[in-house]
A protein has these predicted regions:
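C-terminal peripheral helix-coil segments that are non-catalytic and often amphipathic
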Residues: 1-10, 106-110, 114, 146, ...
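Short, hydrophobic secondary-structure boundary micro-motifs
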Residues: 120-122, 160, 164
Length: 214
């Protein structure tokens, strides 16, 4: 049984941990605003510190550099996106493959919309920024490509997808469609309303059914 002193100490530790987490999150949110306004390369640590209203020393308690802030933001976005990519179900009672893919694409697009400012920064600034960022993006897109391939392979095994389909190339096409829609409508035309359902339907219908009348 814990003593009162131990319980009190545990409480202080929990509060300190919560405060640190809140302060770190606040710095990251301030960095998102600053990167959005100025761009990554034009933003300095001083800009982030000023936006966050913290001392420079406080910043360095949480982050080593501007690039580590960017990596933390990238990790946050990728974690949210990964959480929405779930396995495809097969067998009796499972929803049709198209419906399952639609649900996954819909949730990925919705997550990007909810994290729009962050997604905007990643798409505008991440490519070619440094090797670690490139590795993280390659790993994420690679995992999403493998997931799509596996879903199509299961569709072939279940008879929902034709056996002659090149699942590797098709998975790349689906992934490319998602990336292009996000880049075009969340970044380059950010002032437009982004209709998640419209684009999720278009991505899945185009990649699974094509455009020719049947």
């Amino acid at each position: 049984m814990e003593s009162k002193a131990e319980v009190k100490a545990d409480g202080r530790t929990e509060r300190a941990t919560a405060i640190r987490a809140e302060r770190r999150a606040h710095i990251l949110e301030s960095a998102i605003r600053t990167f959005s306004e100025k761009g990554y390369h034009q933003t300095s640590i001083a800009d982030i510190v000023e936006a966050a209203g913290v001392a420079r020393g406080t910043f360095y308690l949480y982050f080593e550099s501007k690039s580590t802030v960017f990596l933390a933001l990238l990790d946050e976005l990728l974690a949210h996106l990964r959480a929405n990519v779930v396995g495809v179900e097969v067998g009796p009672g499972a929803a049709p493959l198209g419906a399952q893919l639609l649900d996954i694409v819909r949730r990925v697009l919705r997550t990007a919309l909810e994290k729009r400012a962050l997604a905007d920064i990643i798409f505008r600034e991440a490519i070619g920024l440094d090797e670690e960022v490139d590795q993280k993006l390659r790993a994420f897109y690679g995992s999403l490509h493998r997931f799509l391939m596996e879903a199509l392979l299961m569709g072939q095994q279940g008879g929902a997808v034709r056996g002659t389909l090149d699942v590797d190339a098709t998975a790349s096409c689906i992934l490319g469609s998602i990336k292009q829609v996000l880049e075009q409508y969340l970044v380059h035309t950010a002032e437009r309303d982004f209709d998640v359902e419209r684009f999720a339907q278009a991505i899945v219908q185009y990649n699974l059914n094509g455009v020719l009348a049947r």
